[in-house]
From Swiss-Prot:
Cross-referenced NCBIfam families: CysI (TIGR02041), PRK13504.1 (NF010029)
Pfam families for this protein: NIR_SIR (PF01077), NIR_SIR_ferr (PF03460)
One GO CC term on file: sulfite reductase complex (NADPH)
Domain of life: Bacteria
GO biological process: cysteine biosynthetic process; hydrogen sulfide biosynthetic process; sulfate assimilation
Similarity section: Belongs to the nitrite and sulfite reductase 4Fe-4S domain family.
Residues the entry annotates as binding siroheme: C483
Protein name in UniProt: Sulfite reductase [NADPH] hemoprotein beta-component
Cofactor: siroheme; [4Fe-4S] cluster
Pathway as given in its UniProt record: Sulfur metabolism; hydrogen sulfide biosynthesis; hydrogen sulfide from sulfite (NADPH route): step 1/1
Cofactor note (record): Binds 1 siroheme per subunit. Binds 1 [4Fe-4S] cluster per subunit.
Length: 570
């Protein structure tokens, strides 16, 4: 990134209303406890509507029936989304059985949704079941604290089934970082777990009384796999190993994908390299990055509040030097690392510990019993007999991890019998969408419900041009907030209106380049016509091993985004 003209360290001006809300919330309590007992509405009112996000929930409604209910003079069918805190995506089979039961008994949709932030979500929790879901999670050692709003969100960690020892070490650091950066308020325990109020003053030594200016995302990544899409995240620890043992991390700061349609002050940005740090400085550096963003992030304009904008305003070097000062270290030069891919290896892989790992492709992460494919039942049956753990991947898939040779055949039989190992194309394996309609209030266009049939059509184009076994990293996101990570795809569709998308092209397979908008506000037939032409050219003109995104840049079809603060919108 270029150093333009470093701006002020702190943005002066009228604070956004979110800052007032946080300050007046009494460390995230608000009047949530009282609101829970209000049976006149299925939702949360006033500030509580936003405060529940700090407790891992979003208030939603079923948009498919919103107009129908309005015509009947009924309020929207309010229900909550709850997102679990699950560092590194590791969940025990006991925990899985508990969440399976809750989804079946206490949610409108009966499904478990794996997310590309390596955790699971429940959709459709009615207000009466909100407290029980938190208590259920607590009973099996889980919680939903800090999985939404202005905190450090769920910490990702590469789901690496090969280097078992290295994964174990990296995963422990993901957990340590997650715990270190958690809020200290007792609001969560008091409201949801009925723990007594303690007569002490709440303090937030890391996050502060008004928490962070905006959401903050952290990863621990083990090269050569970039499955966690580090450039979508504020703070990234890239594992550096010697002789198979973790010795330290390269730190990259300031990635982020969300934009606002037409707002040229917003842009997607890849993360900047700060340097290498030995393991013993990890928590101090993590805290220093977070507190620097806490103090310097823009609290007057939430559209410009993320770390990526702070870096561009103050300058990368200035931010880095402040992190060094706060952490009491000097970064060493970046150590060599390389990424070769970011997809999951579907199927069986043997780890170096002689245990087997079975990665199951779960289209769009939606676990439900479909006609002829009872996925949810199948995973429950596996959970009942499996001695190891499950790992949720950042590609919305699920790994049955650490399977001994003696159990391999039984687990494979269960998986096959329940439609969990059906053959799918490489293209489908490398396609992903956010939830969008009907539950997301921000959705502008379909995503999860659109992608399967759209993928069928892209597969047909690949077949037509003689490359059916090829794949293009393809993502669909229902709005420009970018949960589907379309801004790191080779083909990225960003919802603009019902049935209409902005088409972005020119990302790469390893997720290190932002795609540029190729066509704006177009329909599915227009998108497919463009892809038919370009994929045809790629099939004929590509160099050996050249991915679709790299081809579009080399062929001059797309001008690469090199400095997004300056050229993202050009």
């Amino acid at each position: 990134m270029s150093e333009k003209h470093p701006g002020p360290l702190v943005v002066e001006g009228k604070l956004s209303d979110a800052e007032r809300m946080k300050l007046e919330s009494n460390y995230l309590r608000g009047t949530i406890a009282e609101d829970l007992n209000d049976g006149l509405t299925g939702g949360f009112k006033g500030d509580n509507f936003l405060l529940i996000r700090f407790h891992g929930m979003y208030q939603q409604d079923d948009r498919d029936i919103r107009a129908e209910r309005a015509a009947q003079k009924l309020e929207p069918r309010h229900a909550m989304l709850l997102r679990c805190r699950l560092p590194g995506g590791v969940i025990t089979t006991t925990q899985w059985q508990a969440i399976d039961k809750f989804a079946a008994d206490n949610t409108i949709y009966g499904s478990i949704r794996l997310t590309n932030r390596q955790t699971f979500q429940f959709h459709g929790i009615l207000k009466k079941n909100v407290k029980p879901v938190h208590q259920m999670l607590h009973s099996v050692g889980l919680d939903a604290l800090a999985t939404a709003n202005d905190m450090n969100r769920n910490v990702l960690c590469t789901s690496n089934p090969y280097e078992s020892q290295l994964h174990a070490e990296a995963y422990e650091w993901a957990k340590k970082i997650s715990e270190h950066l958690l809020p200290r308020t007792r609001a969560y325990a008091e409201i949801w777990l009925d723990q007594e109020k303690v007569a002490t003053t709440d303090e937030e030594p890391i996050l502060g009384a008004t928490y962070l200016p905006r959401k903050f995302k952290t990863t621990v990544v083990i090269p050569p796999q970039n499955d966690i899409d580090l450039h979508a995240n504020d703070m990234n620890f890239v594992a550096i190993a010697e002789n198979g043992k973790l010795v330290g991390f390269n730190l990259l700061v300031g990635g982020g994908l969300s934009i606002e349609h037409g707002n040229k002050k917003t842009y997607a940005r890849t993360a900047s390299e700060f340097g290498y740090l030995p393991l013993e400085h990890t928590l101090a550096v993590a805290e220093a990055v977070v507190t620097t963003q806490r103090d310097w992030g823009n609290r007057t304009d939430r559209k410009n509040a993320k770390t990526k904008y702070t870096l561009e305003r103050v300058g990368v070097d200035t931010f880095k030097e402040e992190v060094e000062r706060r952490a009491g270290i000097k970064f060493e030069p970046i150590r060599p690392y390389e990424f070769t891919g970011r997809g999951d290896r579907i199927g069986w892989v043997k780890g170096i510990d002689d245990k087997w790992h079975l990665t199951l492709f779960i289209e769009n992460g939606r676990i439900l019993d479909y006609p002829g494919r009872p996925l949810k039942t199948g995973l429950l049956e596996i959970a009942k007999i499996h001695q190891g753990e499950f790992r949720i991947t950042a590609n919305q898939n699920l790994i049955i991890a650490s399977v001994p040779e003696s159990q391999k055949a039984k687990i494979e039989t269960l998986a096959r019998d329940h439609g969990l190992m059906n053959a799918v194309s490489a293209q489908r394996e490398n396609s992903m969408a956010c939830v969008s309609f009907p539950t997301c209030p921000l959705a502008m266009a379909e995503a999860e419900r659109f992608l399967p049939s759209f993928t069928d059509k892209v597969e047909a184009i690949l077949e037509k041009h003689g490359i059916p076994d090829e794949h293009i990293v393809m993502r669909v996101t229902g709005c420009p907030n970018g949960c589907g990570r379309a801004m790191l795809a080779e083909i990225g569709l960003v919802g603009k209106a019902p049935g209409r998308y902005n088409l972005h092209l020119g990302g790469n397979r390893i997720g290190s380049r932002i795609p540029r908008m190729y066509k704006e506000n177009i329909t599915e037939p227009d998108i497919l016509a463009s892809l038919d032409e370009l994929i045809g050219r790629w099939a004929k003109e590509r160099e050996a091993g050249e991915g679709f995104g790299d081809f579009t840049v080399r062929a001059g079809i797309i001008r690469p985004v090199l400095d997004p603060a300056r050229d993202f919108w050009e």
